[in-house]
């Protein structure tokens, strides 16, 4: 098994172990507070850190160059994503997108000529004659596991292990319910404290969601946080409760943005006339005799 296949296998194993998390979240009481933390472009951030580079301004992809250009990039640095490159592209898509960007840069460059290259986004911003370049880093799964373990131990400084659920190599759920009183902090303040420790000690930026159950904190992180302006460290923290979820996300589309709603399931829902979470919520209120009811879900 090569390095990329090892990474895919580990991610699959994490997902198998966590299929019950969504079901457990619905039983949480309203006085609970949960936190989800996702490490931003984790593999790419680790590779930048190992090179002494800042992932927020370094253009880097994690991919196995020994394979063809159809190989999937395991990660794209935050800086490179700013140019419109998605998080899990194939390598040839990165190549094509960078070529397109450099054609545009050449059109506005002095004398319509790019005289050098740079993988530093800050240099590219101020020097129009530079061509966009990027680093291709070979996957190192053992190294990523070591960083993930180090970050887990940072969380353990603040939270007991029984209140931390490791969802994947770069994502955790934390029950914060009893810790705000212990530390005298709001959920946002406690989340930021842990995330800043992670950043300073590992060079990895994180995004977080806070909610009254596991589902809401996950959706806050996955959807709401993306629309927030990052702070100076690239961090985003969003919060949802049942009321704000209904207010902000009942009409959100596409459904595939929501946790565990894949394209196949979304298609079946749309075939039934259900296009939003609001549609689904109203459907669940239907009586057995009604055309829309909980059974059809």
Residue ranges, per PLM feature:
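Gly/Gly-Pro- and Ser/Thr-rich, intrinsically disordered tail segments characteristic of DNA damage-repair
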Residues: 1-297
């Amino acid at each position: 098994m090569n390095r990329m296949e090892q990474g895919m296998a580990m991610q699959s194993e994490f997902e198998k172990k966590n299929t019950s998390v969504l079901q457990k979240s619905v039983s949480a009481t309203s006085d609970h507070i949960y936190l989800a933390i996702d490490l931003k472009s984790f593999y790419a951030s680790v590779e930048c850190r190992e090179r002494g580079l800042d992932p927020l301004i370094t253009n880097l992809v994690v991919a196995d160059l020994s394979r063809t250009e159809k190989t999937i990039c395991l990660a794209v640095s935050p800086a490179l994503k700013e140019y419109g490159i998605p998080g899990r592209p194939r390598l040839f898509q990165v190549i094509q997108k960078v070529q397109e960007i450099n054609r545009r840069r050449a059109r506005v460059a002095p004398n319509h000529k790019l005289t050098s290259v740079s993988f530093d986004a800050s240099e590219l911003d101020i020097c129009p004659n530079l061509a966009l370049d990027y680093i291709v880093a070979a996957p190192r799964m053992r190294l990523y596991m070591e960083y993930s373990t180090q970050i887990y131990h940072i969380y353990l400084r603040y939270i007991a292990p029984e209140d931390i659920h490791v969802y994947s190599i770069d994502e955790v759920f934390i029950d914060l319910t009893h810790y705000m009183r212990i530390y005298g902090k709001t959920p946002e303040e406690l989340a930021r404290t842990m995330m800043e420790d992670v950043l300073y000690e590992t060079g990895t930026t994180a995004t977080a969601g806070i909610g009254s159950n596991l589902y809401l904190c996950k959706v806050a992180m996955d959807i709401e946080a993306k629309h927030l302006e990052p702070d100076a460290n690239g961090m985003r923290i969003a919060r949802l409760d049942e009321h704000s979820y209904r207010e902000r996300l009942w009409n959100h589309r596409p459904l595939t943005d929501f946790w565990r709603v894949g394209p196949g399931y979304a298609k079946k829902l749309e075939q039934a006339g259900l296009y939003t979470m609001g549609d689904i919520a109203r459907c669940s209120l239907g009586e057995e005799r009604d055309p829309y009811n909980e059974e059809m879900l």
